[in-house]
């Protein structure tokens, strides 16, 4: 089976209020249980806010280390799930369920091995 990265994109800004976020997290946990029961779930995690990011890049002969995200954007990767699926259509099916659970855009990309 192929593996796919499901990236969850969230808008920049403060975290949602707990009363908004708690039902979403319950739905995500239920979906994760469904993925595990179907042997589709490999790994997943949420990410700390973008202000905790550090970027390392080569510039000429030097390596530069800077605080913050790589690029300014209106949204950023806030979490991800790695799944195994028979094909892209099956991966898109899981991504649709994740988009409904999170109410956020999900990017689906095959993983190279």
Could you describe each region identified by the protein language model?
Residues 1-113:
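Conserved, structured core segments of small domains
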